[in-house]
Amino acid sequence: MKAAVVGMLNNVGSSTSHHGGGYYHVMMNILKAEHPGELFFNPDPSTWNEYERLYILEGVNYQENVFNFIGGPQPEHRAKLEAMAKYTGLAIAVNVPIDLNVFNKRFGIDHQFTSINCIDFAKLYGDTTRKLVRGDSHSLSVWKPGYGLDRTDGKTLFGFLKDADTLIDKWNEKYDEVILYFGNIDLRFHLMRQENPQQATGELFRRYVQFAKKLNNATLVNLLPVEHESRKLPGTGLYLKQPYFGTRQQRMELRDTANRIMNNSGLNTLQWPDEWIDEDGMKMFEYMEPKQSVHLKPRYYMFSDQFIK
């Protein structure tokens, strides 16, 4: 079956320097594994009817039917929409629903678009392989081929553990292996605001370990080294209008506590290179994406050599 992967807002990217590119690399790998044939990426909209199936893959920050046209709607957006109006094959939204009638409000094309089926391939793939990566936005950086992905941006470890025990039986039926990656958000924004940060960190990560030990085969990921305090974050990345709470040194000490608990638990753990750590955290800027962000460049993902060419 001849199929293509396209984006309505932006073309499917392949950057190895930006978080968004990491998402595309992960999803391209999953789609290639799930699709029974060759996939083509970003063909010209005038050729879309040559493909029996179109996978519509929007970017990492896309939310259902929220269309942010950077610089305003462009001719290429209209060309894609007009191509979809003429498309006679099967269109599938990847992971997040898309309503082209909402998209069309900015263009006014005389066409009523039919509903597009949405399939969460990221999670579905894990159902097939019985392997899952579960975490916050950082979970992209520890995804590896053969694993599904269940990503909740902004999810804290504290929040995840609130109802985590309800997942145990379900996960043990569905998955033989699970990689868990939470905690960086707690370290940045929450732990240093507790009455006794060291105690709070210890209690939180011991609960994490206890949960993970109830799963068939869980792997925990160590927290990232803390970058220099001069790192700028976008407004959407702030909490209570602050980029972090606690000094870098204080947070590095809590990181050491958290990682020690995980590494001494008897569970499998994934650890970031010690070479990333220097005296003041400036070296981390080499490994983080160049824009204002807390994320790694995809080329430094834990298993990048297995799926990013």
Q: Where on the chain are the PLM-derived regions?
A:
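Serine-esterase "nucleophile elbow" of acetyl-processing enzymes
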Residues: K2-P36, A79-A85, I92-L161, T166-K174
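Alpha-helical cap/lid subdomain in secreted, periplasmic
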Residues: G21-I30, H35, P43-F107, D165-H295
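A polyanion-binding, active-site-adjacent surface
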Residues: F40
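Conserved active-site regions of diverse hydrolases
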Residues: C118, A122, D136-L140, K144-D150, ...
